[in-house]
């Protein structure tokens, strides 16, 4: 019998990432875990619908036995079984992030006995989670270099707080993992601005694009009007394609916040990324830790290692026989498998 791993949910950033990473790793390694103080660092601690959906999805995919899987629970015991490929559908029942649920279960399906399709309904444009286009255009091309073949499709947008969005991913078992080397970003090839609108006046998008164009030379400017019943909602994104990597940044519009202020937030974030020669942005860095650990080799550079990143590394090191090294030089941190 494999040993039970005990995790403190208040560790590091004290959010849901600890739980999501633990679920992924438990499914992959077969190691059971118990976690207490779930989301202790949040205003509403314990399991929300999004986290509960991730737990139930993980349990279904590997036939796990679970204790504490209920809304508001701050303690969970997860004993995994065998991961099975198949066609899965999960509903969050709120505007909780579809992509974070997918992020939890897809790594385990890399080790399944056959191809899988996972469909999740809930929120697709959430201010605290990566949108589907980030997964599709940024993360998945990098995963392909590592040897992971999955394809995400956004079937319907769902903005906060209404939700109602649908995201699906098709994934195949991984034959072998390759080393990912992302030390240098390289020169910028082009930048693309994009705005999504659903039930929001078009002039909002035009003002957001104008704000982006006032700070960057945009090779493309796209405005997409979605059906009104998928809103109301507004997301503005800026994609930076460089020689070695494509990064994508986004801000979700809010009520009573002007288009100019929303776009200015995005401008600030992109300028912070471009001010450093590091290849990887803060959000992407979190998502590369697990696949890199499974490969057992690789490295990337990031300007500032976030609390999210450090917490994720700590959880991975509890489940897998790997150690990460972080070396800071001239304001750039190189993250690698030692």
UniProtKB/Swiss-Prot annotation:
It is found in: Cytoplasm. Its EC number is 6.5.1.4. ATP binds at residues 103, 283-287. GO terms for molecular function: ATP binding; RNA-3'-phosphate cyclase activity. GO terms for cellular component: cytoplasm. The active site is at residue 308. Its main location: cytoplasm. It catalyses: a 3'-end 3'-phospho-ribonucleotide-RNA + ATP = a 3'-end 2',3'-cyclophospho-ribonucleotide-RNA + AMP + diphosphate. InterPro entries: RNA3'-term_phos_cycl_insert (IPR013791), RNA3'_phos_cyclase_dom (IPR023797), RNA3'_phos_cyclase_dom_sf (IPR037136), RNA3'_term_phos_cyc (IPR000228), RNA3'_term_phos_cyc_type_1 (IPR017770), RNA3'_term_phos_cycl-like_CS (IPR020719), RNA3'P_cycl/enolpyr_Trfase_a/b (IPR013792), RPTC_insert (IPR036553). Keywords: ATP-binding, Cytoplasm, Ligase, Nucleotide-binding. It holds the Pfam family RTC. Transmembrane segments: none annotated. GO terms for biological process: RNA processing. Belongs to the RNA 3'-terminal cyclase family. Type 1 subfamily. PANTHER family: RNA 3' TERMINAL PHOSPHATE CYCLASE, RNA 3'-TERMINAL PHOSPHATE CYCLASE. Catalyzes the conversion of 3'-phosphate to a 2',3'-cyclic phosphodiester at the end of RNA. The mechanism of action of the enzyme occurs in 3 steps: (A) adenylation of the enzyme by ATP; (B) transfer of adenylate to an RNA-N3'P to produce RNA-N3'PP5'A; (C) and attack of the adjacent 2'-hydroxyl on the 3'-phosphorus in the diester linkage to produce the cyclic end product. The biological role of this enzyme is unknown but it is likely to function in some aspects of cellular RNA processing. This is RNA 3'-terminal phosphate cyclase. It comes from Escherichia coli O1:K1 / APEC.
């Amino acid at each position: 019998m494999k040993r039970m791993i005990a995790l403190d949910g208040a560790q590091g950033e004290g959010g849901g990432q600890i739980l999501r990473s633990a679920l992924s790793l438990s499914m992959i390694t077969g190691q059971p875990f118990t976690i207490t103080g779930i989301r202790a660092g949040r205003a509403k601690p314990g399991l929300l619908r999004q986290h509960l959906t991730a737990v139930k999805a993980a349990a279904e995919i590997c036939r796990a036995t679970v204790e504490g899987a209920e809304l508001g629970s701050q303690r969970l015991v997860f004993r995994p079984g065998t991961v099975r490929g198949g066609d899965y559908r999960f509903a969050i029942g709120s505007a909780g992030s579809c992509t974070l649920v997918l992020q939890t279960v897809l790594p385990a399906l890399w080790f399944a006995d056959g191809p899988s399709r996972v469909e999740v309904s809930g929120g697709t444009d959430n201010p605290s989670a990566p949108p589907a286009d980030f997964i599709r255009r940024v993360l998945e091309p990098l995963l392909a270099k590592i040897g992971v073949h999955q394809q995400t499709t956004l079937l319907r947008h769902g903005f906060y707080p209404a939700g109602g969005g649908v995201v699906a991913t098709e994934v195949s078992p991984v034959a072998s993992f390759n080393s990912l080397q992302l030390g240098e970003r390289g020169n910028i090839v082009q930048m693309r601005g994009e705005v999504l609108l659903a039930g929001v006046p078009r002039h909002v998008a035009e003002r957001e694009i104008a704000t982006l164009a006032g700070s960057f030379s945009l090779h493309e400017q796209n405005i997409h009007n979605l059906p009104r019943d998928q809103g109301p909602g507004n997301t503005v994104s800026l994609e930076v394609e460089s020689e070695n990597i494509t990064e994508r940044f986004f801000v979700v519009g809010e009520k009573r916040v002007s288009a100019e202020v929303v776009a200015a937030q995005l401008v600030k974030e992109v300028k912070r990324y471009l001010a450093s020669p590091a290849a990887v942005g803060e959000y992407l860095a979190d998502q590369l830790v697990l696949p890199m650990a499974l490969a057992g080799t690789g490295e990337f550079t990031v300007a500032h290692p976030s609390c999210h990143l450090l917490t994720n590394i700590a959880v991975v090191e509890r489940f897998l026989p790997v150690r990460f090294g972080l070396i800071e030089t001239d304001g750039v941190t190189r993250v690698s498998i030692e």
